[in-house]
Amino acid sequence: MCEVVTILERELNNAGLIYIYQEGDGKWYAYEQSAFYLSQMMSGLSLGRYIMDGTLWLARAEVDVNLLPWENIVSYSKTEYVLHYTPHNGFHEWLAEIKE
């Protein structure tokens, strides 16, 4: 998994950016508020909980980067996409609904 501390720092103060990371399995994932924002922007995401070290869980969305709305992309590289998004309330309610 990508550097967890970096992800958590970004998501703690996330005010309208969506961070998507390519992981070792070759798949792309968004976490926490980025996953929430992305779920508001795109339908059909695979959402779930990522359990880390058996104690900490993070909301995670698997992303097909070929379906991203290109007009929202701020930057991208081989391992990361950053998109702009106008945030909405409801993250904590959405988080409570994610199944294990």
Give names to the regions the model predicted:
Residues 1-100:
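Basic, polar low-complexity surface loops/patches
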